[in-house]
Amino acid sequence: MKLWAGRFHKELDQKTNDFNSSISFDSRMVREDIEGSIAHATMLGSCGIIDSTEAKQICAELKKILDEVESGALNIDLESEDIHTFVEGELTTRLGAAGKRLHTARSRNDQVALDVKLYLKKQCDVLYQQIQEFIVVLCHKALDYKDIVMPGYTHMQRAQPITFGHHLMAYSEMLQRDMSRLADTKKRMDECPLGSGALAGTTYPLNREMTASLLGFERVTNNSLDGVSDRDFCMELASDIAIAMVHLSRFSEEIILWCSWEFKFVELDDAFSTGSSIMPQKKNPDIAELVRGKSGRTIGDLMTLLTMMKGLPLAYDKDMQEDKEAIFDAIDTLHMCLTSFIPMIETMKVLPGNMRKAAAGGFINATDCADYLVGKGLPFRDAYKITGELVAECIESGLTLETLPIETYQKYDVHFADDVYKAISLESCVNGRKVIGGPAPENVEFQAKRVLKIMGVK
């Protein structure tokens, strides 16, 4: 069945037909297509555009078709051009003339825009809930390790001591922004395009607000041209997903480093690791590596959508068929990555001793030494210079700031006293950072509990 065959005298070339078809990937929207058709038929009957009895027949049969497809009793015909053609063809086979009335006052252009929006709205909710689940896992783990000292890094060099709980809460913040972006995107796509027709609306007296309400949309689109040609919602969701995947990729990179013998901060559970076919000792963080790699895939999906849309005149162009494979792939990728990543982090074994050992080296408490002098009345720049000289002294003598004799300290500045050793201890360095957003254990506990409350967890 072809919905556009009237003016043609030849059948479409078979290879071209295969090239033109989208049923292989848009069939996942069968529920959304039927939901949209039921709302459309209900509205047509209510407005007297088609007979109300026929409208009820159409709706009842569409529900049967959906039930049969989802139960496996009816297979989607992959020879159909797209999911819209399959559903309408199946309906017409069953109802005859009544089925042919369904497409009154509707184009595939506004139909597909509707289907994609309905599908993506649902997927926004799915991804939102998954990310929320991940945040809860991170918060619980942060509470467990709120006082475990580890090095904080800049330029991949040990910089200042923090806690592992603080580090985990940094990713919680990123993921909360991801949730916020998804919610914002859903708000902007909450406009029903049905009634826009091919591009110029319709002469039929439609009740667009009725179909929008039946389908759970907040409002209708305000311009028929924009209604059928807009794919901002696809690009925006793809951007949200790409950013979320970049966050997962950064976390993955750290997990990969932390699992190495050079760091040995964490150990992944066997259920989320693989081995080598030749090296018996290997335990590889393949899940984290795959997530890191797949982030590039979602960035590619975003680039596909942006590049596809950048040169299209209004209104609909066949190029826009390419939107679905890109956005579906992005959705599937993030969903799949989160499905494995969340339990990988939840079951990850933390090795506090190795974290603390790493934090004890590299003069990670030098800033606190400078702050000690500031507390004694010195300007920070002077304190900074003196501490730098002390670090150089330690390096030359093979000592640390903790083992450097007090006499040597006082050679550089008379303000140093025995209390400097307490001031530069790892516990003091971390516990003293009670500023909002700082790594002090009490801060980590407060922030984790605050976020859990926001997530609805008591």
What is each stretch, according to the model?
Residues 116, 124, 128, 143, ...:
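Charged, flexible cofactor/metal-binding loops and thiol motifs
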Residues 1-36, 97-98, 279-458:
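Glycine-rich cofactor/substrate-binding loops
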Residues 39-42, 118, 122, 235-239, ...:
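Positions in alpha-helical segments
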Residues 41, 62, 138, 241, ...:
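Short alpha-helical scaffolding segments that buttress acidic/His motifs in well-ordered protein cores
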Residues 37, 84, 88, 234-237, ...:
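Short runs of predominantly hydrophobic/aromatic residues within well-ordered alpha helices
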Residues 1-201, 206-213, 274-275, 286, ...:
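A helix-coil-helix interface module used to build multimeric assemblies
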